[in-house]
């Protein structure tokens, strides 16, 4: 059974988050949670928080055990951009785009080999 958790409007660029997301795909849920604790990027902290939420959803809503779960996929999509203006020469203004991301973590049960 698939279980998912979504973190919307995360204040990080999706481009910076996708390499962290790719690194945990296919791992056991608990192993991925522990690996992300030592990953030296801001995106790892946000994905770890979302992964913890997905594990809690599986345990509380679907009565699944954390040791039976693996990371089926982590999707990082673009969210809306905040626009800020910076004054430039001759009275003009430059646009600074503050990017956001939507992080979706999908967990699934491991297949039993019996």
Curated annotation (Swiss-Prot):
Keywords of this entry: Ribonucleoprotein, Ribosomal protein, RNA-binding, rRNA-binding
One GO cellular component term noted in the UniProt record for this chain: cytosolic large ribosomal subunit
UniProt-listed GO biological process terms: translation
GO molecular function terms noted in the UniProt entry: rRNA binding; structural constituent of ribosome
Residues spanning the signal sequence: none
Pfam families (UniProt xref): Ribosomal_L22
NCBIfam families xref list: rplV_bact (TIGR01044)
Assigned protein family: Belongs to the universal ribosomal protein uL22 family.
Oligomer status and interactors: Part of the 50S ribosomal subunit.
Function: This protein binds specifically to 23S rRNA; its binding is stimulated by other ribosomal proteins, e.g. L4, L17, and L20. It is important during the early stages of 50S assembly. It makes multiple contacts with different domains of the 23S rRNA in the assembled 50S subunit and ribosome.
The protein's name in its UniProt record: Large ribosomal subunit protein uL22
Species of origin: Methylacidiphilum infernorum (isolate V4)
